[in-house]
Amino acid sequence: MHFRTPESLLTPAMRDVLSRMARANRPPFHTLTPGQARAAYESGSNVLELPRQVLARVVDFGIPVRDGHVVAARLYAPSTQKLPVLLYFHGGGFTIGSIDTHDGLCRQLSHLAACAVVSVDYRLAPEHQFPVAAHDAWDTLRWLAGHAEELGLDAHQLAVGGDSAGGTLAAMCALLARDTGLPLALQLLFYPGCASHQDMASHRRFAKGFVLDEAD
């Protein structure tokens, strides 16, 4: 594929998003403390301007994991029928993001796919270092597989998904599910990190001006 500039690959809507982010002129996340970065991400989470879809069910609950912690979760469903369910992990580099920052996205996924979505607040670094997030992700998937019926969901149509770091967790869960015989219907992965290196041609091509900038 040949193109003149990386910007030429963007849709007008995405160019507008990047323009608004540039005008906001906020400090890079890596210059902030974890608390400051999370607050900044939270305040800017409506940058995509997704409409807040009204759904038949939006329920907050908790999922217990191996060390006794209870992971906060939110169920979205467009109807009260027995629906397929997507377990969704938010993005944020394993350090920022939450159920609330991805509320609009999960509402849209539930509405457009006509399925239930369960979004989870896995624990974040640096307070909770590896493998805590990975354990939280896998434990919530196993719990949902065993308790979907109690939530009025179809345990036989279970999927995992996520964006960025959440996509990484979803891919990991899919591999563990394969190896342990836990059946999944599909993976829904939005730009997951699935390699240990960051030196591909696309990293260099989009190093500046595309949300995640290469450090100087």
Positions of predicted regions on the chain:
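A glycine/proline-hinged amphipathic helix-loop "lid/cap" segment
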Residues: 1-71, 75
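Gly/Ser-rich "nucleophile elbow"/oxyanion-hole loop immediately N-terminal to the catalytic nucleophile
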Residues: 145-160
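Gly/Ala-rich beta-loop-alpha elbow adjacent to hydrolase catalytic centers
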Residues: 162, 166, 170
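Short beta-strand element of the alpha/beta-hydrolase
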Residues: 83-92
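Hydrolase active-site cap/lid region
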Residues: 175-216
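Short beta-to-alpha linker loops that shape the active-site pocket of alpha/beta-hydrolase fold enzymes
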Residues: 121-125, 193
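Short amphipathic alpha-helix adjacent to the substrate-entry channel of hydrolases
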Residues: 100-120
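Short beta-strand immediately N-terminal to the catalytic nucleophile in serine-hydrolase-like folds
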Residues: 160-162, 190
